[in-house]
Amino acid sequence: MDQLEERGHLLTEQINPKSRNLDQLTPLELVDLFNQEDAQTLRAIAQARQELAQAIEITAQALGRGGRLFYVGAGTSGRLGVLDAAECPPTFCTHPDLVQGIIAGGAAALVRSSENLEDRPEDGASAIAQRHIIDKDVVVGISAGGTTPFVHGAIEAAKQRGAKTIAMSCVPIEQVPIIVDIDIRLLTGPEILAGSTRLKAGTVTKMALNILSTGVMVCLGKVYGNRMVDVSVTNRKLHDRALRMLQDLTDLSREEAGFLLERSGRKVKLALLMHWTGLDAQMGQELLNNYHGNLRNAVQGYKTNV
């Protein structure tokens, strides 16, 4: 049998002194303790602000040049990556291939724990090869403890292919050095339930992924102000949201907004451009394409040239 690596020194494996009596707390005391400990996630994000900003910048540049974004992880980390990737098409009307989540064990691991599969670095490397990752792409390796072999295998394979690499972990660099382009450390301390990184580590990872993907989409012109003008109108809730955006930004009535939305093919961004410029759908789409889908730049460019 292979000798097990000692991991007790890792921050995510250490014992939290504030929760030593966890099994003796009342429900209200449990809630209060979680609330106090979860405050560390905000501090962790603040401490990693520079690295997160750099990650947004290089990822937006890569996607702007035709690249793709991949999240790679196992267990909770993998599920969070898949979740964030899955939210991009409905929120920003992106192609499903643009942002992808890779989890050790594949789709089955999303609903049933397959933690034993994270110990195979060759599987991580294989996942990179299967998706034909190239130098235009960005790979984010997510591992709370920073040691997941599946993730390290994927990162090394991505580096060999020339892709930009980002690491996201919850342990100090001196405990687990990782050689990547951007190293994001989200230090939230020991978990309330020792070693259960689905707790603070999972929460702060979700926060960081929210910031990364949303920041990238902002840079790519997928929003106008703070509105998701590239929303995919696929159900009644999103249809209503689209109409309200048009009403708020144009002062049209709900009925008028509905007509405009239909004329645009239910594309909010195009509908706004049509309203503000007087262009039809075809001309409006051509103008948007000329400005790489950035609504604000397209409107300003049109006004400058008329």
UniProtKB/Swiss-Prot annotation:
Enzyme Commission identifier(s): 4.2.1.126
Signal sequence bounds: none
Chain ranges of the SIS domain: 59-222
Pathway: Amino-sugar metabolism; N-acetylmuramate degradation
GO molecular function per UniProt: carbohydrate derivative binding; carbon-oxygen lyase activity; ether hydrolase activity
Active site: E87, E118
Keyword Lyase found: yes
Pfam families referenced in this protein's UniProt entry, alphabetically: GKRP-like_C, GKRP_SIS_N
Reaction catalysed by this enzyme: N-acetyl-D-muramate 6-phosphate + H2O = N-acetyl-D-glucosamine 6-phosphate + (R)-lactate
Family the entry assigns: Belongs to the GCKR-like family. MurNAc-6-P etherase subfamily.
Function: Specifically catalyzes the cleavage of the D-lactyl ether substituent of MurNAc 6-phosphate, producing GlcNAc 6-phosphate and D-lactate.
Additional information: A lyase-type mechanism (elimination/hydration) is suggested for the cleavage of the lactyl ether bond of MurNAc 6-phosphate, with the formation of an alpha,beta-unsaturated aldehyde intermediate with (E)-stereochemistry, followed by the syn addition of water to give product.
Oligomeric and partner information: Homodimer.
Designated name of the protein: N-acetylmuramic acid 6-phosphate etherase
Lineage, highest ranks first: Bacteria, Bacillati, Cyanobacteriota, Cyanophyceae, Oscillatoriophycideae
